[in-house]
């Protein structure tokens, strides 16, 4: 093989630059690299007693150098494909026009904020630890997901501002929208139990009452609600925080945003599959390397921006300045080129929360109504135990949490 191929999209261009510090070129050429391949020390069991992590053992797949070379090569190939267009053509509405940082350009190299990369489906073993109380570990259970796209970045303040303008103009999600019609014969995510199959039903209009602005009554409703939760990344007017991930958004608003933007909330199985690297079942989205405290792999432990925070912190950050612009941890690149799958803000998912897995699971979701919904990925305040793709938290869907954000998924 010749010299390292150049990356063909901004996300992977930046990833290739960052990973060059740990010999990404050698990985592409098939030469094993200890950082990409993992080693016995780094592949030790994840400490589940860390802050916001549960107890129990964690078995992780050993990433070989060859697998990692394929991963980076695949990321380049996937990133070279066009980002999805919404129905009728054009980019997703949150990134339409020339909105500048946080709207049309994200990350240090100015990627399209709406880049959405293909996650190639497959089967993996689900074994989660859960929070916020910790201590619960579910037994292993297989799950299969079909191909889907997962956005490269968490939703930014700038992108959400476009959504606020749309709701101010009267937009609300249509009844039944947000269903993953690409799976299960067009019926969407399913749950099989006691001889019956239940399918997702999409947006319920009664949920609009749980949004900040249910009737398009004015942008001021959003300002009041989003700023009640502190520290909030939202500002009433555009400013220096447009590239920060939006936090303090509740589940209903997260779901509505993704519908408006031409996508949907990923299921718990889909999100976990992407974060674990599919069948590789990585310890962290990037592999087995310890994330350290220099904000290169993940924004966590109140370490941002100077790396001088408190490892395994339990929520001592008190300012939006402790939350990083999306894409600020370049070595945290997931198998399919997503960034910030661990840390910064946790990501709200479609499923209701349950201690038991949906089984069997083929494009499944927990559809039995409950008082909480699943969130995954850890946040800027968590300890290292919550950076695993297996970690899950749960929150009431109307709750605003300063650690919580959203990332959308899309049809392949």
Region spans (language model):
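Ser/Thr-rich, Pro/Gly/Ala-heavy low-complexity intrinsically disordered linkers and tails
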Residues: 23-105, 133
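Functional-site microenvironments in short loops/helix caps that host divalent-cation chemistry
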Residues: 118-119, 125, 200, 204, ...
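Sec-dependent bacterial lipoprotein signal peptides
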Residues: 1-23
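Extracellular secreted precursors and ectodomains with disulfide-bonded cysteine-rich loops/domains
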Residues: 23, 93, 104, 111-112, ...
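A short glycine-rich, aromatic-capped structural motif
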Residues: 107-225, 229-230, 248-250, 343
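Residues within well-ordered beta-strands of beta-sheet-rich folds
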Residues: 149-151, 159-161, 255, 260, ...
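Short, structured beta-strand segments at or near domain termini in extracellular proteins/domains
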Residues: 401-412
């Amino acid at each position: 093989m010749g010299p390292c191929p150049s990356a063909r999209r901004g996300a992977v261009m930046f990833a290739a630059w960052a990973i060059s510090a740990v010999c990404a070129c050698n990985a592409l050429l098939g030469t094993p690299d200890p950082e990409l391949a993992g080693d016995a020390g780094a592949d030790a069991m994840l400490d589940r007693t860390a802050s916001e992590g549960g107890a129990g053992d964690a078995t992780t797949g050993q990433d070989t150098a060859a697998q990692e070379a394929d991963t980076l090569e695949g990321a380049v190939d996937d990133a070279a494909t066009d980002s999805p267009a919404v129905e009728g053509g054009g980019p997703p509405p949150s990134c339409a026009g020339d909105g500048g940082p946080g709207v049309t350009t994200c990350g240090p190299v100015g990627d399209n904020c709406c880049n959405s990369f293909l996650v190639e489906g497959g089967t993996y073993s689900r074994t989660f630890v859960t929070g916020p109380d910790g201590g619960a570990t579910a037994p292993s259970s297989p799950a299969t997901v079909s191909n889907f796209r997962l956005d490269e970045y968490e939703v930014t303040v700038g992108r959400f501002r476009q959504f606020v303008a749309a709701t101010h103009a009267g937009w609300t999600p249509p009844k039944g929208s947000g269903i993953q019609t690409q799976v299960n014969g067009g019926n969407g995510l399913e749950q099989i139990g006691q001889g019956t199959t239940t399918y997702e039903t999409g947006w319920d209009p009664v949920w609009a009452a749980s949004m900040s602005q249910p009737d398009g009554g004015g942008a001021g409703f959003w300002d009041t609600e989003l700023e009640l939760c502190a520290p909030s990344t939202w500002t009433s007017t555009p400013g220096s925080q447009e590239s920060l991930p939006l936090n303090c958004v509740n589940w209903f608003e997260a779901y509505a945003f993704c519908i408006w933007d031409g996508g949907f909330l990923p299921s718990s199985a889909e999100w976990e599959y992407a974060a674990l690297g599919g069948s590789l079942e990585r310890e962290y989205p990037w592999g087995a390397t310890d994330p350290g405290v220099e904000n290169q792999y993940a924004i966590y432990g109140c370490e941002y921006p100077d790396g001088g925070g408190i490892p395994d912190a339990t929520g001592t950050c008190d300012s939006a300045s402790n939350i990083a612009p999306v894409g600020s941890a370049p070595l945290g690149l997931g198998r399919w080129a997503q960034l910030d799958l661990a840390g910064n803000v946790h990501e709200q998912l479609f499923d209701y929360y349950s201690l038991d897995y949906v089984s069997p699971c083929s494009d499944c979701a927990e559809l039995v109504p409950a008082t909480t919904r699943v969130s995954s990925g850890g946040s800027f305040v968590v300890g290292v135990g919550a950076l695993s793709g297996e970690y899950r938290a749960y929150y009431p869907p109307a709750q605003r949490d300063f650690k919580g954000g959203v990332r959308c998924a899309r049809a392949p």
